Amino acid sequence: MELGSRRIYTTMPSKLRSSSSLLPRILLLSLLLLLFYSLILRRPITSNIASPPPCDLFSGRWVFNPETPKPLYDETCPFHRNAWNCLRNKRDNMDVINSWRWEPNGCGLSRIDPTRFLGMMRNKNVGFVGDSLNENFLVSFLCILRVADPSAIKWKKKKAWRGAYFPKFNVTVAYHRAVLLAKYQWQARSSAEANQDGVKGTYRVDVDVPANEWINVTSFYDVLIFNSGHWWGYDKFPKETPLVFYRKGKPINPPLDILPGFELVLQNMVSYIQREVPAKTLKFWRLQSPRHFYGGDWNQNGSCLLDKPLEENQLDLWFDPRNNGVNKEARKINQIIKNELQTTKIKLLDLTHLSEFRADAHPAIWLGKQDAVAIWGQDCMHWCLPGVPDTWVDILAELILTNLKTE
């Protein structure tokens, strides 16, 4: 039909009919293509390019940076132990000691955020069990965490040697002193017996009985950090006062030397931990902290008056047992621990290597008491606070929070 010069179609022209019939097909095809590509993109892409290895916080190097942020605490922290409070004791070079920053290979290590950490740990508890190096570790931890809760109070319940309660977060962090982990006690001998062979008495070690200080408290903690090592030497238990090992209440025959005795104690303590400590508890074993005595042991005028960290190529000379140096025991002890823990779920806290460098960071002669060095010698075993244990805390906090996120 035509109106004037305009043509009006009462039916759709063939060209329009054909194009309109194609439109749904095009839309359908487009949707199918989008679906296809979305599925392709969701599939993992295989490649022969190796993915980067997981971050190893324990391998790296110390980097000096005068702009490194100052420690989170100072000499006024109420949880200090006097001999390690190197700021109060006016130790030389404390600014320099704390200007070195640990940089792991291939990744970064963030300084602990005390508020975030305690917030994540709300209503949870952290326990340290072992010798005074775990106490050294704990004191650093307490002073750092107190930044987030200045109302923290000292806590010595449940046979804890030292600790703190953080009421703002309902968190307890404490240390239980158990230097051998196993139960041990002094057994004196009569004067007549001592005169015969020179042995004044013995220390009985029950290899299968945990020390009273921690045997019944592990269920209280959500995180536990164990260690033992520094007492397993002849400087602590010389031939005049040796260790004698017992099992099931009876002396072990033939008698064991110190390191085989340590190995047997370790086997029994690890077995107890796996059997008795709740499976949900996050368990760490801190490897040995190295000593840095130079020129003799602690009781032989050994010294550590160094002003910078060791170089990488010096470490084996100081610590490799094959060189029979003064400080060889750490790696020997560590190998025994690694062998025993390799089939367990206890996580290794390998702080040894990073600490081996830091010969410059011990209290040395700055012990806070006038006659301390004359009586005890230099302290080249424990660490100045603030100092290297603050880096241990950074690493431990990172590992704890990582494990909490994956629960």
Curated annotation (Swiss-Prot):
Keywords: Membrane, Signal-anchor, Transmembrane, Transmembrane helix. A motif (DCXHWCLPGXXDXWN motif) lies at residues 379-393. Pfam families: PC-Esterase, PMR5N. A motif (GDS motif) lies at residues 130-132. It is a single-pass type II membrane protein. Belongs to the PC-esterase family. TBL subfamily. This is Protein trichome birefringence-like 12. The gene is TBL12.
